[in-house]
Amino acid sequence: MRKSPLALLLSLICLISSHNEIQAQGHPPTDSLRQRAAASVGKEKHDLLMRIAMSTNDIADWDATLNDAIDRCDTPAICRSRLNRIQCLFNFYSVDSAIIEARESLPFILNAKQYSFYFSTYNTFISGLFKQRRFDEAREEATTMFETAQQGLTR
């Protein structure tokens, strides 16, 4: 069955107007998550804050997850929040800021023995150096990361 160009055009107009109407509504799922987070406590609140931050990639939302983890003295959540914030900076904001923050966060994450977050943060840090074409520094940092991993495996 062949559709007329007019029918296709009308379908496209309806689709675009539906999309625009949805966009005009803001982020209803995020708004409801914010309401639930405001009424929640503990890990449940933190998980909701993480979902909000992942959906918006707004640095203020990542700050909220980090501050919540700090308030709860939850070291793994602090490390995860720092990593996610750094990756958000790297992907959506400033690579310079991501590099600075990663450099500052690495000792804390290593001392906390959160190795998965540590090596993910280090990898993001090195990727930032590559993105800035700082190849020699990236190579040196990759060597340092490898040596750190070897020391952890031989202990």
What is the predicted function of each stretch?
Residues L6-A7, L49:
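Short amphipathic alpha-helical "recognition" segments used for binding
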Residues M1-S4:
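Positively charged n-region of N-terminal signal peptides that target proteins for export
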Residues A7-S17:
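Bacterial N-terminal signal peptides
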Residues I22-R155:
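A "functional boundary" signal
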